[in-house]
Amino acid sequence: MGRPKQGRRPLCANCDPVSDKKILIFTTGFGDGHNSAARNLKDVFEHMPGFDAEVHDTYVEVNPGASRFLQVAYNISIQRVPVTWKAFFHVFDKTPVFEATLPTLGKLKAAMRALLLEKKPAAVVTTYPVYSYLLRALMESGEVATCPHFMVVTDSIVINRVWNRAPADWDLVANEPTADAMAEAGVPREKIKVLGFPVSPRFEELAKRPLPPGPPWKILYLPSASRRTVGKVVRGLTALEGIHLTVVTGRHRHLHDFLKKLDVPMSSFSLHGWTDRMPELLAESHLFIGKAGGAIVQETLAIARPMIISHVVAGQEEGNVELLADLGAGTLATTPEAIIEAVRVAMLESGGARWKRWRENLQRVSHPAAARQTAEFIAALSA
């Protein structure tokens, strides 16, 4: 199958010049990056006069039960049986099997059609590639009016065929290596725009703050491993002189309860459960440890905090590991012993020379204002 036809779309003919221009953002819960990008863009548009943005997870709206099941299955697959997800990623990347599934998405397409007819958007943003195929089909068939379509690509460097072949007027990517990878895969270079990943608008202000003083050097750890592994990491890091550890367990209540009872003094580290203060916690830290998820990696880049990647999902997250290595902004360490040693070398050896080098490299490529700049780019072409 050839690549779907590209080309600029005319401005929406149904826009009301008196009312705010509607921006429709389509997202999904398969991974954090899609939703993060969508929410952050909406947050920016809320403060832009003349625009009104809405975020829709049409998968959930059409069939909430099935969507939740698929999200749980996705999370189990990437965490417990990653070989399954790797095989799935490979099949969709190397074969045209995805295109064969499009006729089965009739309900999803109908829901998008209803929203587009009701809202009459000045522009559409998709943060998940499936929507891009359905949107183009609706526009080309004349079922909905055409308007500019912006696709926010939430992966880096290792870009699946489903993204590369997805039709859009503009592909908005996080960095130059991703733009190069997509162009090499056949995406017209002139439709790729490097604007950075749209992280929370809060990062724009947080990035202006000075680094926290040290020592002690503040390490932020977002674990995604077993209690046994996490316990070893916490014991090892709290034993390092000159290190203060903060652990965020998120929604993993069992892990939170386990760490509260761990045989180390609670005074040696800080413990948080679910929090909406991740931007602030990153800004208050010197180094981050966590999985190579698209959203969190881009947040560490935005705030210029080096990262130790402790877990990688085969497929799309491999690109984030490659990105970090290319930038010289961190390292991969997937065992407790490797994590502890990586922290020791980076922060405590030779006056923290390695950490300082990582940080300097990040400062050259940081995009803390990416959400605002992306929204401004969309707004300018939707006017």
Where do the protein language model's features map onto the residues?
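Active-site-proximal region of nucleotide-activated glycan assembly enzymes
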Residues: E140-V194, P198-R202
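Donor-nucleotide binding loops and adjacent catalytic segments primarily
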Residues: A207, P213-E284
